UniProtKB/Swiss-Prot annotation:
Gene designation per UniProt: matK
Biological processes annotated in GO: mRNA processing; RNA splicing; tRNA processing
GO cellular component, one term: chloroplast
Protein name: Maturase K
Keywords attached to this entry: Chloroplast, mRNA processing, Plastid, RNA-binding, tRNA processing
Entries under Pfam families matching the protein: Intron_maturas2 (PF01348), MatK_N (PF01824)
Function: Usually encoded in the trnK tRNA gene intron. Probably assists in splicing its own and other chloroplast group II introns.
Database matches in InterPro entries: Domain_X, Maturase_MatK, Maturase_MatK_N
Disulphide connectivity of cysteines: none
Subcellular localization(s) per the UniProt record: Plastid, Chloroplast
Record bears the keyword Metal-binding: no
Amino acid sequence: MEEFQGYLELDRSQQHDFLYPLIFREYIYALAHDRGLNRSVLLDNVSYDKKSSLLIIKRLISRMYQQNHFIISVNDSNQNKFFGYNKNLYSQMISEGFAVIVEIPFSLRLVSSLEETETVKSYNLRSIHSIFPFFEDKFPHLNYASDVLIPYPIHLEILVQTLRYCVKDPSSLHLLRLFLHEYYNWNTLITPKKSIFAKSNQRLFLLLYNSYVCEYESILLFLRNQSNHLRLTSSGILFERIRFYEKIKYPVEEVFANDFPATLWFFKDPFIQYVRYQGKSILASKDTPLLMNKWKYYLVHFWQCHFYVWSQPGRIHINQLSKHSFDFLGYLSSIRPNISVVRSQLLENSFLMDNAMKKLDTLFPIIPMIGSLAKVKFCNTSGHPISKSSWADSSDSDIIDRFVRIGENLSHYYSGSSKKKSLYRIKYILRLSCVKTLARKHKSTVRTFLKRLGPKLLDEFFTEEEQIFSLLFPRTSSTLKRFYRGRIWYLDILCINDLVNHE
């Protein structure tokens, strides 16, 4: 944000905080280009760094100044004179530049809020693994959890409307609407993985989708505030108790349908926990399923009335944490009892007591992971390793580095797994697939290739963490062995690997 503060001060004084004129500034596209170059190595570099140049940017801005080029009929959309032969490149440049512009209000709001609250920036909280210590601390005390799939908006206009609260410039919203209408299919959000979240325009559409999700989450804050008001008010003032008990005799659906505005006042709000990543969220509670069904109804009703999305109640699954596991962020988590026996001595009598405590168990999803490996041709559907034929043309070191990198990323991400046996099986599949790929390249058998290369080839698949722990803590000690196999949460994981994301 600091890198273009100087540019913004000049534009603010001249344009009164309008964002629309920034689309004609060359430094906006330069910033978008630099951000593409500085992406994390874990992500694909999808920027236009090899095609972009200052001359192309100047040509694009000069064409945008000619407003008649923006007036394009629907019938003539295939022969767009504005983009010409550089249609894909120009549209990508505009989308990435516009993403930088729209991020400005959000960045300014974040900076001002941090300054007001004097909050110290903690980049560790950005790690995906920071959610699991929260699970370990809160979820063992809860009873029910709602597995919620946030519906996709059926129309791009909904995404544009969600920005109107933060972007006060109508011209920018009109430009975004025109850009989306002319160069993208309005119905592509129904199948987001195919077109709208294409890698070439991922930044802009992720920004729009995140603003849409923030709008969806606003109802949770509203319901929480409404329910908290009940704690400060006497129940006798709010309603008559006889009428209340009459209502709960009827089915939950009738109560909600007949008394929608007042339903919030009939139940005390218990300890609610909410977490979300991408389009999946979990709403956990300590109370009865009746309250969870109430929250379920409000979410579905909010989607239908505010976003005009016909959401089926089946997108929200209510499960009991002690009996069902939930899949979140690639881990299969469940709450299981941890029983410990305590011996108590009282004078001459001694007796044993069972102390039962709930504990979060995070497991490695072996079956979905084998399915992910089978899709990218590392093994078959049964988990039998096969050679990666598309990599056979690469050098030996390149092939080994690719397999080792995949194994290290999986070991790093699943370091918090309660049981590592399934993870070791996946690493075995990767090792044998690497050997088979090398043997295929050299037209040899696996046994012959291993004899020629030696066992040091497989040592490459040990991660740096495993090597350090094996040196510091020998496995002869049972205590250190349990520590070696314990769960470790890292604070540098900012994204999910494609193999981890099974959906």
